[in-house]
Amino acid sequence: MTEQFVATFKRSEAPSSRGKYLSRVFGIFSEEIVRIWAADPRAPFEDLGRPTLRMDGEDGYSTLDFTLRSRESGQVYPAELKCEIEYQGYRYFVLTGTKQLDHHSKPAFAALLDAALKRPGLRAFVNKNEIAVDGAILIWGAATNEGREVVVDAKGFSAVLTIADMIADLQACQSAPFRMLINERRTWSNELCDALLGPG
């Protein structure tokens, strides 16, 4: 699925504006794809909601994208989606190594790294209820096997998931909620274009 997913956006014969446009459109609803995947009972994780992380003794806090709980073990992981597709010439599209993480300097990503390393004093909350966490999960656009392994080893993530694999799972099981989401977004896009073109 990785090659197919990449080719959806990155085509050598197409103008660069195509990739920019598709990347922005996809970014509008990419988080919804993760939620639909996690809501499917066949997925290895379920989503408990957006987690808030903060360190004891510090005033600031960070809210991340997901709280993934393993359906097998019950372990809980804050998770963040980083799906930068066309940005800087697709430099961060496919995860191949740790250097691609270095430009993420915002507090939320730092909190994710703290959770991955199980930093003492880190507290997590979902819907204002404190929860125990067992690490952290990174969700990328696509990744090589080596890229996953290197990042897990270097940063301590419990797993590196990709939205490309999630889409493949949803396609394989013909997920009705996923198909509804995509068809709805396609309808909205067509309605906009039709309106801009005007009558006949």
Question: Where do the protein language model's features map onto the residues?
Answer:
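Interdomain/boundary linker segments immediately adjacent to catalytic/signaling cores
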Residues: M1-R42, E46-L53, G200
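Generic structural signal of hydrophobic/aromatic residues within well-ordered alpha-helices
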Residues: R18, L22-V25, F109-L113, L122, ...
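Conserved catalytic cores of phosphodiester-cleaving nucleases, focusing on short active-site segments
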Residues: A38, F66-L68, E72-E86, K99
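Short, surface-exposed secondary-structure junctions/capping segments
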Residues: A38, T98-H104, A176-M180
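Active-site metal-binding core of divalent-cation-utilizing nuclease and nuclease-like domains
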Residues: L48-G74
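Catalytic cores of nucleic-acid endonucleases
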Residues: L81-A168
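Polybasic (Lys/Arg-rich)
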Residues: K155-P199
